Amino acid sequence: MKKLIASLSFLFIWNCANAQDPVDYVDPFIGTTNFGTCNPGAVCPNGLMSVVPFNVMGSEDNTYDKDSRWWSTPYDYTNSYFTGLSHVNLSGVGCPEMGSLLLMPTAGELNVDYHHYGSKYEKETASPGYYSLQLTKYNIKVEATATLRTGLTRFTFPKGKSHILMNLGGRADQ
């Protein structure tokens, strides 16, 4: 009987040690393609702020581009060209048609045309309340987080000239 109790106690303790929180099962990339209009950005449940990657303009390599057709979401998982972080988009309803204020970090010489300052990216990760990626063109790490009433971004730049551009929503030819 003592061996049975010891074995059950061991299994209970081992199971508790390996337990995951429900947040560990969240996949922020669900619904980010095939017209799902969701985004993997830093969003806090019931929060007033969402910091969202914007990858739907500026490159012919993108599957979906907001300037070539109607497209109501700031992000599509199949796209690969990043032009900034939006701080005003809702997940699940799209909404860049109402305007998107984008922050975009760049390095080197200043260029304000999003067709040229945008960048491909890698190392994209997302979890509830956090989003990050690495801009391959500039070697800049982009991170975003959100709380109930605040969105924060952090850009880690290489040495040399660097810029943070703010796109107020116009097209490059305007």
Model-derived regions, located:
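Accessory carbohydrate-recognition regions in carbohydrate-active enzymes
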Residues: 20-174
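Bacterial Sec-dependent N-terminal signal peptides
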Residues: 1-20
